[in-house]
Amino acid sequence: MDLRHLLFTLALVCANDSLSASDDLLQWPQISKCRSPELETFSCYWTDGKVTTSGTIQLLYMKRSDEDWKECPDYITAGENSCYFNTSYTSIWIPYCVKLANKDEVFDEKCFSVDEIVLPDPPVHLNWTLLNTSQTGIHGDIQVRWDPPPTADVQKGWITLEYELQYKEVNETKWKELEPRLSTVVPLYSLKMGRDYEIRVRSRQRTSEKFGEFSEILYVSFTQAGIEFVHCAEEIEFPWFLVVVFGVCGLAVTAILILLSKQPRLKMLIFPPVPVPKIKGIDPDLLKKGKLDEVNSILASHDNYKTQLYNDDLWVEFIELDIDDSDEKNRVSDTDRLLSDDHLKSHSCLGAKDDDSGRASCYEPDIPETDFSASDTCDAISDIDQFKKVTEKEEDLLCLHRKDDVEALQSLANTDTQQPHTSTQSESRESWPPFADSTDSANPSVQTQLSNQNSLTNTDFYAQVSDITPAGSVVLSPGQKSKVGRAQCESCTEQNFTMDNAYFCEADVKKCIAVISQEEDEPRVQEQSCNEDTYFTTESLTTTGINLGASMAETPSMEMPVPDYTSIHIVHSPQGLVLNATALPVPEKEFNMSCGYVSTDQLNKIMP
C-alpha cells in the first residue's frame, strides 16, 4: 500500500509541474503565427498573456543581412496584437527574425522565410450547377465553381494555388474530401436527390503543405433548384454482402458434394493402398492362412514355378548340346550301336518324346514308370546301398554296353571254368614273381578284364552328347576308360617281396594267391626259386584253399563290363542336359588281422 501511495504522489507532482509549466507559458506573451496571403506582404500575430501593460510589448524584426533590430512598421493594418509588413518591408528570398520583448526582457522569438509562411485567403464566390440526373431520379450530378482569393495574384502567375473541396450531407458530421487540384471547377457525382449537402473549399501554395482557411459553406438543395423530385423509397442498393455470403456457402456445399461422391477415388489418390503379394494362379487367401502345402502343390503343377531338379553335389554337371556340329553327325562312334533301334526297344530309358522339339528327352515328368528313383535319390539312400542297386540293374538302367562285349566276356568266363587244371599249372609257374622283384607283360585281354573289375569305382559318370537322331535318341560320345583300375592291377602284379626273411605273413600269401588266380591266363617267362630253409605254418592251408576257390568263383561275376555313360535326368536349358548321378562305391575297409607264418616248404606245397 505504501508503494502505491508513493507512486500516486509522484504522478500528481509531475502533473502539477507540467500544468504549472504550461500555465507559466500561457502567462508570457507568445508569437502565434506569421502568414503571407499572396507572397508579397506578410503579417505576424501574438498574444499578451497576463501582462496588463500592453503598450510596453514591442515586435522587433531583423533581416539576416542587417545586424540591428528594428521595430514593427505597422501595428494597425493587420489588427490588434499584429504587425503588418507591406511590400517595401518584404523581401521574399531573405530570411526574417522577429521577437516579442519589452525594455527589460524578451518573451518570444522566431525566424522564417516569406515563402514558408504563405497561407492564401479562402476562395470566394462559390456556386454549383446541376449537370444531370439518373433515369430513376434518385441520383444527380452537379458542378461546383469558385474564384481564387482576391489577394493572390494568380492570373499573373506570381503564385500558384491548389484547391481542396470537401462536402457532406447536412445531418452528417464527417466531411468527404476530394484530391487537391489546380482547377476552380470540380464536378460531384451521384449525389442523392432529396438530400441537402454542404460544400466548402480551401487553398494552399503548390509548394507548401499548409492549407489556408476554408471558404464560406455552400448549401446544395435540389428542391430549391426547382427540380421535381418524386419521393420514393430508399434507393435499392445491390446486396453485395448477401451475394458474397451465399456464394461462399454455395461453393462449400458443392465441394462437400464432390468429396462425398468421389470419396473412394480421392481416398485412393490421397492414401494409395499398399500392394499385396500376388502370384498368378494362387489364391492370396492361401498365403494369408499359411497353407504352404497347397501353395507348393500349385507351384509344382506349373512349369514356370517348378523348382530346379538338379542335385547339389559338385560332380553333377550341365552338358551343352552342340546340335549344329555337322562333323559329329557324320562321325560313327561306339554309341551308334549302343543306341540302335533294337537296343532302344528293349530299354526305354531315352525313349521319351518332347512335344516342343520332336527330339528325345528324358525329362522326368514324361517318364513316370522308369526306375530312376533307385539311382537318383542320393539323399535318401546310402552310398553302399546305392552301389549295390546300380550293380544289380546297371544293364537295364544305364543301357550303355554293347551286347557283343557281354558275350565276349561270358565266353572268356566259360573258358576259365572249363580249364581249371591249366590255370593251376600256369599259377604254379607264375606264383613266384611277387617274391623275386620281377615284372611281367600281361595279356591285353586279361588286363581289360581286370580293369573292368575296378572300373565301376573310377568311371567318370558323364558323357558328351554328340548328336540327337531323328528318331529321338540321344547319341553320346565314348566315355573315358578306367585308368585307376588298370593302375591298381599293374601295381598289384608288380609288388615285390624280398626273400630276406624266412617267414611269410599269411595275408601276403593270400594276396599273392588272389593275384595269381586273376592272372591265370597270362604267360610267364621268368622262373622263381625259394630258399630251402624257409617254412610257413599249416593253419592257413585251409584258408588259402578256400580263398583260392572263392576268388575263382567270383571272377566271372566281377568281369561284367561297367558302363562309361549315364542316363539323362532333365533338360535344363535348350542346350544343356542334367545326367543322373550314380554314387561311387565305397571301398570296404581293410582290417589288419593277426596272421601266422608259413615256411617255404609249405608254401611250395600250397602253390600249384
Curated annotation (Swiss-Prot):
Modifications after synthesis and translation: On GH binding, proteolytically cleaved, in vitro, to produce GHBP.
Q: Where is the composition biased (Polar residues)?
A: 413-426, 438-451
Provide the alphabetized UniProt keywords: Cell membrane, Disulfide bond, Dwarfism, Endocytosis, Glycoprotein, Membrane, Phosphoprotein, Receptor, Secreted, Signal, Transmembrane, Transmembrane helix
Q: Which residues lie on this side of the membrane: Extracellular?
A: 17-237
| Any one of the GO CC terms | external side of plasma membrane
**SUPFAM superfamilies linked to this entry:** Fibronectin type III
Report the record's Gene Ontology biological process terms. cytokine-mediated signaling pathway; endocytosis; growth hormone receptor signaling pathway; positive regulation of cell population proliferation; positive regulation of receptor signaling pathway via JAK-STAT
According to the UniProt topology, which residue ranges lie Cytoplasmic?
262-608
Supply the PROSITE patterns for this chain: FN3, HEMATOPO_REC_L_F1
Task: Pinpoint motif Box 1 motif by residue range.
Answer: 270-278
Q: Where is this motif: UbE motif?
A: 313-322
Give a yes or no for keyword Transport in this entry: no
Q: Give the membrane topology.
A: Single-pass type I membrane protein
Domain Fibronectin type-III per the UniProt entry, residue ranges: 122-226
Question: Which cysteines link up through disulfide bonds?
Answer: 34-44, 72-83, 97-111
Query: Where is it located?
Result: Cell membrane
Q: Which GO terms describe its molecular function?
A: cytokine binding; growth hormone receptor activity; peptide hormone binding
In chain numbering, motif WSXWS motif lies across 211-215
Which is an annotated Pfam family here?
GHBP
Q: Which disease is it linked to?
A: Defects in GHR are a cause of sex-linked dwarf chicken. A restriction fragment length polymorphism, and an aberrantly-sized transcript in liver leads to a GHR with undetectable GH-binding activity causing growth deficiency and other endocrine abnormalities.
Query: Any idea what this protein is called?
Result: Growth hormone receptor
Which lineage do the record's taxonomy fields give for this organism? Answer: Eukaryota, Metazoa, Chordata, Craniata, Vertebrata
